[in-house]
Amino acid sequence: MYPAHLLVLLAVCVSLLGASAISPRPLNLIQFSQLIQCANKGKRATYHYMDYGCYCSKGGSGTPVDALDRCCKTHDDCYGQAEKKGCFPLLSLYNFACFPGAPQCGKGNTCQRFVCACDLKAALCFAKSPYNNNYNIDIKKKCQTLIYMRLQTQ
């Protein structure tokens, strides 16, 4: 093999190693957003649900502040169950249909169906739960876990 070919091969290998270190992007958030819009018939933009309460953001801790926040906690728990089954919920693309106010999951493999069911349940829960503008809060201050709060008081 020529030295130039070895250099090209080495460059490709280094590029692939660098690309593998890039975190995957949450691909299904667009689908989840579409399910939310379908379920609530476009009454509230999806971005309103970001940073709502203690669980409607990345991660979550503490006690859910209301019914809508409980929807988000249930959704987080559902994604946790999906991960235990070997699924990657943020990367799972699935099929669904939007019938006004009644989205439905379509066919797919076990993980796609499971993740779609998580998103569908959350979207329907969001649609029926009241939205309180006061709960778009700073989670670092308001949503500490009980253990963390106990440690601070000792």
From Swiss-Prot:
SMART domains: PA2c (SM00085). Its cofactor is Ca(2+). One of its GO terms (molecular function) is toxin activity. Residues 1-21 form the signal peptide. It comes from the Eukaryota. Disulfide bonds join C38-C98, C54-C143, C56-C72, C71-C125, C78-C118, C87-C111, C105-C116. Its EC number is 3.1.1.4. InterPro entries: PLipase_A2 (IPR001211), PLipase_A2_Asp_AS (IPR033112), PLipase_A2_dom (IPR016090), PLipase_A2_dom_sf (IPR036444), PLipase_A2_His_AS (IPR033113). CDD domains: PLA2c. It is found in: Secreted. Residues 22-27 form a propeptide. It holds the Pfam family Phospholip_A2_1. The keyword Disulfide bond applies. SUPFAM superfamilies: Phospholipase A2, PLA2. This is Basic phospholipase A2 PC20.
